[in-house]
Amino acid sequence: GSTGTPKAVVVSHRCVIDFISCFVETFNITSEENIANQAPFDFDVSIKDIFSGVFTGATVHLVPKMFFSFPTKLLDFLEERNITTLIWAVSALCIISSLDGFSYKVPSSLKKIMFSGEVMPVKHIHNWQKFITNAKYVTHYGPTEITCNCTYHIINEVIPEDGIIPMGIPFKNERVFLLDENNKLITEPGINGEVCVSGTCVAPGYYNNWDKTNSVFTQNPLEIRRFERIYRTGDLAKYG
């Protein structure tokens, strides 16, 4: 996990392979792309950088950590390396917009800007869209326990200043659904429920912690005729 005490999530090779194969297909990542790696290698977001390159032949550029304290150096790096693709934490994108980085330089080669890890403030996505108009903007949602992400939303609409960016739709190798406090499926809009995930993305569990594993990696209560393992995220969501 990214905050607090490390959760020590065990993620299998199969989970990574299945997720990345869907990821590169969904976003049409090719060998022509230059990806700027922002996430440390002990953070799950880095899986998308590393293995997108391995799967497709795209070039992965390692951004020096210190550059994220100096937006001018960071923007120079993106321009000099002809970076086409960012798969960054929200906070990294906000550094540039909050410090008015685009008044110094607007990278000309960016085509795909993807982000995850926390809610993107609308004012920051508006700032990026104002200066980089031809890029595809995509938000990702999902915890480490389901191998990085389980949903995505391509931002084609104008998000109101007081609005929020939707979680989006599931990747094709995953099923995402909402359960109420009685483990009943929620299908109506506007009703809060716990986000639950099934599919080949679900991790085996937590290293050497069976009690915690068994509390959130459970049998799907909607399936009574066959075994289906799900991850209960603890996050609440509702259909719009």
PLM features per residue range, with description:
Residues K7-A36, P40, D44-T84, E157:
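Conserved AMP-binding/adenylation subdomain of ANL enzymes
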Residues T5, F43, F67, P121, ...:
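Nucleotide-sugar-dependent glycosyltransferase donor-binding/catalytic pocket residues
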Residues G1-S12, V16-F19, I29, I35, ...:
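A generic "structured core" feature
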Residues R14, S91, E118, T200-C201:
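Alpha-helix/helix-capping structural signal
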Residues F55-A58, I83-I87, L93, S97-P166, ...:
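Gly/Ser/Thr-rich phosphate-binding loop
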Residues V10-S12, D44, A89, P121, ...:
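GHKL-family ATP-binding catalytic core of two-component histidine kinases
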Residues V16, K130-T139, I154-G240:
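AMP-dependent adenylate-forming
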